[in-house]
Amino acid sequence: MRIITFSALACAAAILAGCVTERSYGQAQEIVRGSPAARQDAINKCAMGVNAGSASRRAEIARIINVSPRSNVGRTYCTRAFNGIASGRITYEDFRKRSPQFIRVVQGR
């Protein structure tokens, strides 16, 4: 069980990290949809990654998602994104292309 949980979280956290296949996106979507604890872990890992980035990158993300650069940009972005993925508001294609729908969701609209 522990190995499955670790790999599930790794899959979910990888969603916002880069190249993701449609299959792995679907797997991660089901994980974060069905497990609030797994979603929170994925958000935490994602936020740490965003917050570890450069100040200019965080400022750019803050502008896009309409928050102050002094706020917890990573947590806001990742929470909105993973909630959108879990709810189905962000599809694989939206995610892959960073579509207007993806942007609306991470902006909190």
Residue ranges and their predicted role:
Residues 53-109:
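Compact alpha-helical subdomains of small soluble proteins
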Residues 10, 43, 75-78:
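Hydrophobic alpha-helical segments
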